[in-house]
């Protein structure tokens, strides 16, 4: 437990001088007791001076303050006691419900499981959301990314997934709010409370008003808690909203530390930082971590280095499209852009694969015909193409679905559609069983039976 003194403060960057024989290691946690502030060592500058990043506000810091070295990286509470609680990056409770009372603490910087410890699974995880279950099915213990620009529904989709999976799966969940709005964190808490699954969720928040060091580490805090449950042999759901803010915090820290920026101003260590986090989110022979990550796409550009780096780590990608949202189709998932490694006849079965493929083929053909329709009109199309267009429009409408978490806004009750019903519905549309129904009957319904019922009412 060596002590040092603050020698320089520039925003969130604090330089601390220690005796030459007691210099802290990189990633060690230091504490300024008088301010209750934790610093994390990032660089050793030589001459006994270390450069640190503050985990909280550095307002009011001054040179000469005493700093104590804890001798280890940041540790956070893990285990059963974290469930139903909201914590910050340091694992301190922020829900005014008293101390956590944890029995164990883990350091947030840990090694990823070794190659031989990892397990491979192809078991499907049903979400109850038609478009996801059909074209980009999730695997239990897999990694899923929800990609989308601002305001296309990443958080609402994630809330619905939590609502559907946490209820049906009845396992444990860890939610890491990385650089998102405080209001969303608040909404999430009450949503979980109303659903009665609060006692199965641990929440870790580092909102967008927090300093960059805090936002950079909060994902690791949440992941550490999820790893503990996994190592106890449980199946955990790990939600991150939003992984882009993690990258952004890394960019800010990198700039503060004076590193030369790389493409588009991102940190030169972008791929490595993303890898450090993503490699730890994995399933072992003891338990599984199924992770769902929201990924903000700057200016709707999927080739931006941040989303492009994230793509490489995922098993399934759910791409949300502004064009689809503008048609009033929610969830605004693009069935042609979204992908999944699970969409393989050997995993999902031949029927599911053929139906998903058929849906994508029809929608792709419709996309190609749109230009012809815009110039020459529908009358110039062959009968076969006309049928394709009518079916594609029905499929587009049928891909929409009322959500449980959006009942307040839409006024229509949420619907959970089983995979069997999803395949049956789309197969019927492709086979022409519902050619006689008006396309509006397919909009915002659950199963295909509801669409038929809606059409008959009219």
UniProtKB/Swiss-Prot annotation:
CDD domains, per database record: ATP-synt_F1_beta_C, ATP-synt_F1_beta_N, F1-ATPase_beta_CD
Membrane topology summary: Peripheral membrane protein
Pfam family, one: ATP-synt_VA_C
Catalytic activity: ATP + H2O + 4 H(+)(in) = ADP + phosphate + 5 H(+)(out)
Keyword Cell membrane belongs to the record: yes
Superkingdom to which the source organism belongs: Bacteria
Coiled coil: none
Entry annotated with the keyword Translocase: yes
Enzyme Commission no: 7.1.2.2
Binding site for ATP: 148-155
Enzyme class: translocase
Alphabetical UniProt keywords: ATP synthesis, ATP-binding, Cell inner membrane, Cell membrane, CF(1), Hydrogen ion transport, Ion transport, Membrane, Nucleotide-binding, Translocase, Transport
GO CC annotation terms, alphabetical: plasma membrane; proton-transporting ATP synthase complex
Example of a GO MF term: ATP hydrolysis activity
Locations listed in the record: Cell inner membrane
SUPFAM superfamilies hit by this protein: C-terminal domain of alpha and beta subunits of F1 ATP synthase, N-terminal domain of alpha and beta subunits of F1 ATP synthase, P-loop containing nucleoside triphosphate hydrolases
Family indicated by similarity: Belongs to the ATPase alpha/beta chains family.
PANTHER family: ATP SYNTHASE, ATP SYNTHASE SUBUNIT BETA, MITOCHONDRIAL
HAMAP family: ATP_synth_beta_bact (MF_01347)
Subunit comment: F-type ATPases have 2 components, CF(1) - the catalytic core - and CF(0) - the membrane proton channel. CF(1) has five subunits: alpha(3), beta(3), gamma(1), delta(1), epsilon(1). CF(0) has three main subunits: a(1), b(2) and c(9-12). The alpha and beta chains form an alternating ring which encloses part of the gamma chain. CF(1) is attached to CF(0) by a central stalk formed by the gamma and epsilon chains, while a peripheral stalk is formed by the delta and b chains.
Job description of the protein: Produces ATP from ADP in the presence of a proton gradient across the membrane. The catalytic sites are hosted primarily by the beta subunits.
Protein name (record): ATP synthase subunit beta
Taxonomic lineage: Bacteria, Pseudomonadati, Pseudomonadota, Gammaproteobacteria, Alteromonadales
Gene name tied to this protein: atpD
């Amino acid at each position: 437990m060596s002590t040092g003194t603050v020698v320089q403060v520039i925003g969130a960057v604090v330089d601390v001088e220690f005796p030459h024989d007691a210099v802290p290691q990189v990633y060690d946690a230091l504490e300024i007791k008088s301010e209750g502030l934790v610093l994390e060592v990032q660089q050793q500058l030589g001459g006994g001076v270390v450069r640190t990043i503050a985990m909280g506000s550095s307002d009011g810091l001054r040179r000469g303050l005493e700093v104590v070295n804890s001798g280890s990286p940041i540790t956070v509470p893990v285990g059963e006691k974290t469930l139903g609680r909201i914590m910050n990056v340091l694992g301190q409770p922020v829900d005014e419900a008293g101390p956590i009372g944890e029995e164990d603490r883990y350091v947030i910087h840990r090694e990823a499981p070794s190659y031989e410890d990892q397990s491979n699974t192809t078991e499907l995880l049903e979400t109850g959301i038609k478009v996801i279950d059909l074209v980009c099915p999730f695997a239990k213990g897999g990694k899923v990314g929800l990609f989308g620009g601002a305001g296309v529904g990443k958080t609402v989709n994630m809330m619905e997934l939590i609502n559907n999976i946490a209820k049906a799966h009845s396992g444990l969940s860890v939610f890491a709010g990385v650089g998102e709005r405080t209001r969303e964190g608040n909404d999430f808490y009450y949503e979980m409370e109303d659903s009665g699954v609060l006692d199965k969720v641990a929440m870790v928040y580092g909102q967008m008003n927090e300093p960059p060091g805090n936002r950079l580490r909060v994902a690791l805090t949440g992941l550490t808690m999820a790893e503990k449950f996994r190592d106890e042999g449980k199946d955990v759901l790990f939600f991150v909203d939003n992984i882009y803010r993690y990258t952004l915090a890394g960019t800010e820290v990198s700039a503060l530390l004076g590193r030369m920026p790389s493409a588009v101003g991102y940190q030169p260590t972008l791929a490595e930082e993303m890898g450090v986090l993503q490699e730890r989110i994995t399933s072992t022979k003891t338990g599984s971590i199924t992770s769902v990550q929201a990924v903000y796409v700057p200016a709707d550009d999927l080739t931006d280095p941040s989303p492009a780096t994230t793509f490489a780590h995922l098993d399934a990608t759910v791409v949300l499209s502004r064009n689809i949202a503008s048609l009033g189709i929610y969830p605004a998932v693009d069935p042609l852009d979204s992908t999944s490694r699970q969409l393989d006849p050997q995993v999902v079965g031949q029927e599911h694969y053929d139906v998903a493929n058929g849906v994508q083929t029809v929608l792709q053909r419709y996309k190609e015909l749109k230009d012809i329709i815009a110039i020459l009109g529908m009358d110039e199309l062959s009968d076969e193409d006309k049928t394709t267009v009518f079916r594609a429009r029905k499929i587009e409408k049928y891909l929409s679905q009322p959500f449980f978490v959006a009942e307040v806004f839409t006024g229509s009750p949420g619907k959970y559609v089983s995979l069997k019903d999803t395949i049956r519905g789309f197969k019927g549309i492709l086979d022409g069983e519902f050619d006689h129904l008006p396309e509006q009957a397919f909009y915002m319904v659950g199963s295909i039976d509801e669409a038929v019922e809606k059409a008959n009412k009219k």
